[in-house]
């Protein structure tokens, strides 16, 4: 479904950005160091962590994104990543994360710590990429049925409408089972980390 896949890069960048926010806040508070983790490992070895983190821990990152989307100020910060020319380099994501409110950053910090700790204590988790992709597409279909203007907002040039569409997609995913939400989050986070692990320059390509 092109109307969904076109913005997967932006949503993936948002998930990575809030995860980095959690790592940054935890680093400042000593949280991750207390557990023996270096926050920079999220970008360097994040895919290994992602493979090992159980569904509830991965879902915690989704819940952090969804909760922040309910706050107008933080939603505006995250929505900036949806613009086609947004800077989704590692530096750009860090700058975006730093602009989030304290409550959101602390929420992401808790989610990030849970991912690091759970991944360190768990074996690799099963993951069906094709199934996760289908669940993401199905969420897009549900959002288009429930929210007038969803497709036009997702594909159009209006910033506010695009943000509303992505938030509608998050709302639909929030009502799905944990395993489904975690699979979609794992898919998007994996795509975002794959980009960050590359040259990190400029905007993440939109597919």
Regions of interest found by a model, annotated:
Residues 2-12:
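Bacterial N-terminal signal peptides that target proteins for export
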Residues 3, 17, 26-31:
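N-terminal leader/presequence regions that precede the main folded/catalytic core
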Residues 12-21:
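Bacterial N-terminal signal peptides
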Residues 27-116:
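N-terminal Sec/ER secretory leader and immediately downstream segment
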Residues 53, 65, 69, 85, ...:
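Generic structural signal for hydrophobic core residues of well-folded globular domains
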Residues 78-80, 140, 162-164:
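Sequence contexts marking disulfide-bonded cysteines in secreted/extracellular proteins
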Residues 90-157:
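Extended amphipathic alpha-helical interaction segments
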Residues 157-207:
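A cross-kingdom marker for long, charged
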